[in-house]
Amino acid sequence: ETLMSDRPGRDPRWPKKRSGFAAFALTEPDAGSDAGACRTTADKTPDGSEYILNGRKCFITNACYADFMCVVASVDRSLGYKGLTMFLVDAHLPGVSIGKHEDKMGIRQSATCDVIFEDVHIPASALIGKEGEGFKIAMKTLEQGRASVGSACVGIMRAILEEAAKYA
């Protein structure tokens, strides 16, 4: 169902996932591969019912098509990576916008874009896992995704070799 849903199969946040398009928003312009340097913030409202999301993500695959995004943001920047938290964010909420589209050399069948969050109100129920678990969740997600990319590359290379052998 998901890597870190705390209520798999019963979680009311996830039905849309089955028919919508998703994006994983971790990388930032000033953080690069250092996820712990995340500057996107999620400030909890005084009554605790919402978080206000502000920041910018870059190199986000298929962000311009996404119906929702798994977004990593800091709830406490003084904690570094231990303050990172993941949220399920509706990509059509007010304050969510798509920025620059990258002109890539390879893997051009998927779009890669910036995503800007400006005072985006998200419900506290949008939390994936718990506050402070965002770094762990993101790393597990990347671990699984990287294995999939490696597998896909092996399959692509096999097909290339088979096609090349036809002409040899």
Feature-to-residue mapping (PLM):
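Short beta-strand or tight-loop elements
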Residues: 22, 36-38, 67, 94, ...
